[in-house]
Amino acid sequence: MAKKGIFISARVHPGESNSSWMMKGVIDFLVSSTPEARALRDNFVFKIVPILNPDGVINGNYRCSLSGQDLNRRWKTPNKVLHPVNFAVKRLIRSFMKEREVLMYCDLHGHSRRKNIFMYGNNIKEAPHSSRVFPYILSKLCDFFSFEQSRFSLSRAKEGTARIAMFRELNIPNIFTMEASFCGADRGELKDLHFTTDNLQTMGKRLLEALIVYSGIPVNKD
């Protein structure tokens, strides 16, 4: 049986450096020698884009690219010249889909107004619970991830975001924007504390652990 695909991206908004710390947690865990990491590598093919907006990061922009574009509003019909990374990533996704079934796309972000870590997903009328299962599992593995704050909708105003554009492209339930507060948590062991870089890296690790639980893949700990 062909391995299923997982696509994870971050830093489309240059100022959201907390997304890079979550991504570091993802990558460090994925390349580790733990039984869980081996199980993930044995069962999935991962495509990872750590920085979607490198020009914006290098030049110190907060939200936009060098062309003054919010790239997370340009996924629907990206321009090869103005939005080259979006254009290339959509081509990569299409190629990936031809190779194998894609199980999940997750785009990592930072949030400046809300506390905790949470997800935005898509509401699928025919199967409304299908997009909620993975975030619910994640909430049971990490007490500063909030399922209650997670939202699921298909808003016309958000059609240009990766979450909705990739849903139109892939037509699968597990397409998420994961948002980490610039502040901290108001629940669990980190209540009333700021998130540290270690906390954010832990969140990246928990994301992959939730994938193990969700997919039911065996973990050989011998």
Regions found by a protein language model. Give the residues of each.
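Structured catalytic-domain cores with a bias toward divalent-metal coordination
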Residues: 1-222
